[in-house]
Amino acid sequence: MNTNNILETIKMIEEEKLDVRTITMGISLLDCIDPDGDKARIKIYDKITKSAEHLVEVGRQIETEFGIPIVNKRVSITPMSIIAGATNETSYVEFARTLDRAAETLGIDFLGGFSALVQKGCTKGDKILISSIPEALAVTKKVCASVNVGCTKSGINMNAVRDMADVIKRTAELTKDQKGFGCAKLVVFANAVEDNPFMAGAFHGVGEAERIINVGVSGPGVVKRALEKVRGASFDVVAETIKQTAFKVTRMGELVANEASRRLDVPFGIVDLSLAPTPAVGDSVAEILEEIGLEQVGTHGTIAALAMLNDAVKKGGVMACSHVGGLSGAFIPVSEDAGMIDAVISGSLNLEKLEGMTCVCSVGLDMIAIPGDTPASTIAGMIADEAAIGVINNKTTAVRIIPAPGCEIGDMVEFGGLLGRAPVMKVNGKSSELFAQRGGRIPAPIHSFKN
């Protein structure tokens, strides 16, 4: 074993903030379906708490034995609209309470899967779940919700887009004492993936196994340090440096995933290669882009730098691990990235530039605060724009946006912890009302017909 590699890994962890962001156990709840809501909730609670009873303990053991920080232990479940749809209940808030109670019992950080997949239309259960989201997120601490409103094969469900804009507004209102924090636990997707370990968008797809272990890594600080050593070099060298660094980071993620899988006796699913920033200085995707040569993120060249970063991360990661999945790229959540926050405050980075950046990176408009009086129709337009980027480019896109109640442009919304703080950003003041009112479906793009 190469001593230099060992010392390099120790340095990456101690000085460059390398960590495993999450070990997420996916759990199928299909065998918990019951027409009696009370019985279904008992089955759900028992299945989750039994399946993941050792998850936190094993995570801590691996952290201690290997010296690798594991920030979060999480659970994802089969989309709840499928499970609860068998009942005759008119609200699924009690299901959310059951999930929250299970999460508290396990001691995990978050539980994802209060979700619905409505890219082509809504079932009765989907409609009830969507209408239940605001109250469900207001009365729970650890439950996360997501709704998939579009995909490349089906187009965009504009009725669902309009409904989700209203849901976001209502969620912000019900959690206004926390500056709309409920919206930080809610994601609207296009092309959602079934094996995502990251919150708030994780759910356990129906094509997945009974239980599965998915791991998400995090290493923006490591990539930035590596690039500091090649200042002034060509883009060829920059891309190769990022690729080699991503390889090392992913190897560590695979080690943790395999070890967790073995100890929990649960199959290993995937490693998600995503570079996930934190609010800490030196753990920022924006700082990587600035190290590549931008005075500040948001200036011209930002999208090209981000595209190269995203691609190089994927290339390095797939060489390190046979099973790569989830979102796998670079996250650009404004509130969780110190460099992004600074760029917004200085005026270098605006909402329109962020939309452009989402065309070439991992997800979409993420953890962005906007004025609390932003109309639902404007939010619907933002969701539709992001969904269109995902559907046309055959990639995952998402919107996790917080219309902060009582806040205006320039105010700072404090969330704390990994969610950080978000400067309230300006949105276009022109109306999208007539656009949002149309409803129906935007058809799938011509290049989706590949059979």
Swiss-Prot record:
The text of the family note is: Belongs to the UPF0210 family.
Known InterPro entries for this protein?
Answer: UPF0210
- Which Gene3D superfamilies does the record cross-reference, listed alphabetically? 3.20.70.20
Q: How does it assemble?
A: Homodimer.
Which lineage is the organism of this entry classified under, starting from the top rank?
Bacteria, Bacillati, Bacillota, Clostridia, Eubacteriales
Q: Which organism is it from?
A: Clostridium beijerinckii (strain ATCC 51743 / NCIMB 8052)
The name this protein carries in UniProt is UPF0210 protein Cbei_2352
Pfam short name (any one): DUF711
